[in-house]
Amino acid sequence: MSGCRVFIGRLNPAAREKDVERFFKGYGRIRDIDLKRGFGFVEFEDPRDADDAVYELDGKELCSERVTIEHARARSRGGRGRGRYSDRFSSRRPRNDRRNAPPVRTENRLIVENLSSRVSWQDLKDFMRQAGEVTFADAHRPKLNEGVVEFASYGDLKNAIEKLSGKEINGRKIKLIEGSKRHSRSRSRSRSRTRSSSRSRSRSRSRSRKSYSRSRSRSRSRSRSKSRSVSRSPVPEKSQKRGSSSRSKSPASVDRQRSRSRSRSRSVDSGN
């Protein structure tokens, strides 16, 4: 298939097929590996996997040697150790096409915590390929010391958690958290916070209503007690004095006083 075969240059002569297979692990299914002395070929089932391998593995170390990875071409290129091969499978896609293509996003997302600031997204992606096929990786965005890795399958995600959680990258042990679980935790926390706030609001409202009803009942009882005290209060002294004076000036008392004064005047006349 056109575009599925890649060339490995500057290959260590001691490299075996297992070493090459391990080197390309996580980049898709491999159909064939053909090793020569100092170079070799790897054929993928999907040309997109070949593009990923060329873009991301060129210049990496394989068996203590920095190898060159590029698409297999029909014409020979001398002067750089590749003039001895010719391949009938030629790549029609330029090498820079993959850089402009958007990454494949999936729901099989891992959150990487405690990530060293020296680790780039490329380093993180290369590290996570030990567990499976990585489709997307990012580092320190939007949060520093935190990365995101997405896998092609959920099985690769679980494999990464089991094998790579707690491993060191640049001197720091990383912690892997499944993205869906972390999202659900944040949702549950926000829901509990809203519930507690609504409960506190309802409690404060009920308390204010109770205090308001109590104050109203107290004011009503006070007004009732005042009205009762006013109705039961004794007659003031002035009114009592007025009543006594009016009683002393009754007609019977006036007649008695007149009769007494007459009897006194008669006794005085008889004495004279």
From Swiss-Prot:
N6-acetyllysine: residues carrying this PTM: 167
Stretches with biased composition (Low complexity): 242-254
Residue numbers spanned by region Disordered: 73-105, 174-272
GO cellular component, one term: nucleolus
Source organism of this protein record: Homo sapiens (Human)
Highest rank taxon of the organism: Eukaryota
Protein known as: Serine/arginine-rich splicing factor 5
Keyword tags: Acetylation, mRNA processing, mRNA splicing, Nucleus, Phosphoprotein, Repeat, RNA-binding
Cross-referenced CDD domains: RRM1_SRSF5 (cd12595), RRM2_SRSF5 (cd12765)
